[in-house]
């Protein structure tokens, strides 16, 4: 029994040391790209949006053209401007040349016209659902009082505020094959800011939308999302897709940013430089793999000791074994390592009661903090003084009993001798 206890203590110390060595940096696990084929020139960035953890990266910091993904920033600034989205604006004459340039470049539009009165919210739907370049220009003009250059400057400033280091904008829509550049990593930063805006996500997650009639459009018009993964009739449709944005130009290739949410967990994905035949296949395979490979699992139970702590004033035990007061679960890959840091009470002296809280353990999964749990004992540890006192009291009690027994027999024996002497004396008479 003593050898078994010593072995458990040694094993616990070795485990604690090993775990301390492994807790260094987040993102320790390396996951292989789970898709059938991917062009080595593409940029891919998959991240767990709940804890901002990178999962897959390929050329994630490479600067490249981003086409209509530009409109994510345009929409973000529009929503952050504080303007009333239900109010109407009139398309100004100052956009005449801008609209001609968009038309000459064969850019997608919702056919806005100079002098047309439209609601801001309809411009936002046109921007994010139909990827309309004229809607982008109208939005920028509205926010910056007609100065598109000032709006572009604000786009670049906002990108820096979000931590982007490879991003530069020269126009508000990304239609032209020059200027607007970013990286998969930077676009993830912009996407996270967009995802925090409820209106953005509601609009971007819309499959189709009806634009109301205006003073220059007598009939309603229905626009359909360029994000085909929102379409149930499309082969790569996924019900976990949550909006965001598509983009395409000759130099940029097919670009895609999306969020995906399932069973309470959210991923963000950026793919740049793909092609029409593969962009949605790649996205669906990557996200399917993520939801299949990562799951909720119990990381810590309450029956296995996590660590030990030195114990004073107790000859029977040199240390106390500490257990988690409650189970701890986390979401991760089967290969993710569980590590701990401890905050233990100092100068622990017996007596220690069963269930005493003697510290905390912070639990990490693949280097990312999951939570903190109390550390408790599963038995009582009695002090030397109490043990010695109990032993002394037991010994004294035993001596008292022994003395009582001896006294009893002495009295009995003494009484018998006295009776015998009396009988002998009586016979002599």
Regions found by a protein language model. Give the residues of each.
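Bacterial N-terminal signal peptides that target proteins for export
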Residues: 2-14
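Active-site-adjacent loops and short helices of periplasmic peptidoglycan-processing enzymes
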Residues: 3, 27-185, 189-198, 262
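Polar/charged alpha-helical tracts
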Residues: 8-9, 97, 150-153, 391, ...
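Intrinsic disorder/low-complexity detector
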Residues: 9, 26-27
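Bacterial N-terminal signal peptides
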Residues: 13-22
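A general structural signal for well-ordered secondary-structure junctions
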Residues: 20, 61, 84, 133, ...
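Domain-terminus/edge residues, biased toward the C-terminal soluble/receptor-binding domains
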Residues: 164-168, 176-428
